[in-house]
Swiss-Prot record:
UniProt region (Disordered), positions on chain: 1-21
Protein name, entry field: Homoserine O-acetyltransferase
Family named by the database record: Belongs to the AB hydrolase superfamily. MetX family.
Compartment list: Cytoplasm
Main location: cytoplasm
Residues annotated for substrate binding in this entry: R231, D361
Presence of keyword Signal: no
Name of the gene this protein is made from: metXA
Length: 389
């Protein structure tokens, strides 16, 4: 936690606690912004063992505020990996059977090149000098990481939310390298409503007087208040009205009566403030700007002449899409439109809509129906791939 609070830079940005793959000037990353990023690095974690045929590799793609620590203790927060409930020895994604890879996306803040990383041209953090990063840029970098392992074809690519966008981009850009794909709680484009919520968050960050045009590391104080407010606003979209009512209702926080002031009278107010305060301990404000922008720019149909089915033309990848009934960030109709496009493209696709009131974040929680869907799809794909149980 102190690694992000203290000093002028984030140590994890340049020298992460996880393995890191560095690319020099001879291997630049081509960006959609029309520039080349060089040098750059990718921080990652792996679990399990790659088999001799290199056919058992699963790539896990993280969401907006996630990282590579999917199934191990996070070195910054000290908390368990964000999907340890799903991934590990003997779990649904069994690391005794599969080789699991998860990388921090380009633009992130836990070891892959991002705005908190040192710009070799200046010796200072990039800040806003880093070109805007897209979902496709993230996937291009991941593809270079997969090449490093000598893996020609991934057995499965899976992820939720922004991770699901990466899954779709993988299946579209590199269909020959993806045997199966599992996009969860996601969409093929970001809606105007979602862009609006992101813009509120970005403006909260940029309105913080400590932001200094993104050069806050040089001033020794980060825009924590703005980032906390951005997180509070975003966190509401990850939940559902039913879940909020069940957990908080209009219950008061550590008091028996209203204070007639502006302290956190209600439990929900206290909860959101806590979410904001803990978030700034583990995430970089500029990375938040970059990550939200990458999601806003994502529009798979627009990248293929306006017809989503053309993004998957001729694909032989097996797909399973999962949505949640109470997810109003990426509602079920978003997944259905992807399923319709895959059907039009002649792809092998299944679709699971899970009844739950836990909202968008259900994909990160202990959700038995989700686990059953993943288990069934992975098992079927493994048999088709010829992977032994």
């Amino acid at each position: 936690m102190a690694a992000l609070r203290a000093g002028k830079t984030n140590n994890e940005a340049d020298q992460p606690s996880s393995p890191v793959l560095r690319f020099g000037a001879d291997k630049p990353l081509k960006l959609d912004a029309g520039t080349l990023l060089s040098p750059f690095q990718i921080a990652y974690q792996t679990y399990g063992t790659l088999n001799d045929a290199r056919s058992n590799a699963i790539l896990v793609c993280h969401a907006l505020t996630g990282d590579q620590h999917v199934a191990n203790t996070n070195p910054v927060t000290g908390k368990p990996g964000w999907w340890e409930v799903l991934i590990g020895p003997g779990r649904i994604i069994d690391t005794n059977r599969f080789f699991v890879i998860c990388s921090n996306v380009i633009g992130g803040c836990l070891g892959s090149t991002g705005p908190a990383s040192t710009n070799p041209a200046t010796g200072k953090p990039y800040g806003l000098d880093l070109p805007v990063i897209t979902i496709r840029d993230m996937v291009r970098a991941q593809q270079m990481l997969i090449d490093h392992f000598g893996i020609e074809k991934l057995f499965c690519v899976l992820g939720g939310s922004m991770g699901g966008m990466q899954v779709l981009e993988w299946a579209s850009s590199y269909p020959e390298r993806v045997f199966s794909a599992l996009p969860i709680a996601t969409g093929a484009r970001h809606s105007s409503q979602n862009i609006a919520f992101h813009e509120v968050g970005r403006q909260a960050v940029m309105a913080d007087p400590d932001w200094h045009g993104g050069k806050y590391f040089e001033n020794g104080k980060r825009p924590e208040k703005g980032l906390a407010v951005a997180r509070m606003a975003a966190h509401i979209t990850y939940l559902s009205e039913a879940a909020l009512h069940r957990k908080f209702g209009r219950n008061l926080q550590d008091r028996e009566a209203l204070t007639f002031g502006f302290d956190a009278d209600f439990q929900i107010e206290s909860y959101l403030r806590h979410q904001g305060m803990t978030f700034v301990d583990r995430f970089d404000a500029n990375s938040y700007l970059y990550m939200t922008r990458s999601m806003d720019y994502f529009d798979l149909a627009a990248d293929h002449g306006g017809r989503l089915a053309d993004a998957f033309a001729g694909t032989k990848t097996r797909f399973c899409l999962v949505s949640f009934t109470s997810d109003w960030l990426f509602p079920t109709e978003e997944s259905r439109s992807i399923v319709h496009a895959l059907n039009a493209a002649g792809a092998s696709v299944s679709f699971v809509e899970i009844e739950t009131d836990r909202g968008h974040d259900a994909f990160l929680l202990d959700e038995p129906e989700l686990f059953a869907a993943i288990n069934g799809f992975i098992g079927s794909a493994a048999r088709a791939r010829g992977l032994s149980a």
